[in-house]
Amino acid sequence: MEHTVSHAPKREKGTGEICDIYDVYGNRTGKTFVRGEPLSDGQYVMVVDVWIVNSNDEILIQKRSLQKKDLPGTWATHSGCVLAGETSLQACIREPREEIGIQILPSQVHKLNRKLRGKLLSENFVVEQDFDLSDAVLQEEEVSAVRWVTVSDLKQMASRREFYRYPEFFDVVRFLEERRKRKDCRKQNTQNNQ
């Protein structure tokens, strides 16, 4: 089944992304702002962090372009602002498609949690999908490289400050551990039934 967005994300020519303003509980206030402009007290922007994991329990990461204002050249997960009129699920699907050319279906998406980070309401998702790196189409102003890494590799990269330290990282690790336990349990049940 194909998932389509009924409207194009709102962008004005010559300006940044137009985003909804939220309250601390994640409710839209009915107001918008141009990304990069300051927010008043009690105003927040919704962002998504998308953790793509494959069947080998590896995580797909991307190296931020050297043109980026924030954290240029740093390895990170796939993330971005939820645009005005867009849901966080739509942003979760849109951001990786724009940045690296991966097509994600809603059935592959698991909402992990929401965390408050300053003025950011960060909705965190895990996407279960295998992806051939040779199929990547990089958005040059955003991404300079992509690669699959193990959790162990990622921990080492974070300790060397090569990978951005996300507050939800250990929630993603827990998700992978629980997924591995479910796989092992199914495998054991299959062997017992033979």
Summary of predicted features, one role per range:
Residues 47-79:
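A glycine-rich, hydrophobic loop/mini-helix early in the fold
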Residues 68, 94-98, 125:
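Recognition helices and adjacent regulatory flanks at domain boundaries
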Residues 2-3, 36, 72-73, 84, ...:
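Nudix hydrolase/Nudix homology domain
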Residues 6-49, 53-55:
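Acidic, metal-coordinating catalytic segment for phosphate/diphosphate chemistry
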Residues 29, 110-112:
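Local beta-strand/beta-hairpin segments that build beta-sheet-rich folds
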Residues 25, 54-57, 65, 128-133, ...:
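Short loop segments at secondary-structure junctions
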Residues 60-61, 77-110:
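The catalytic Nudix box helix
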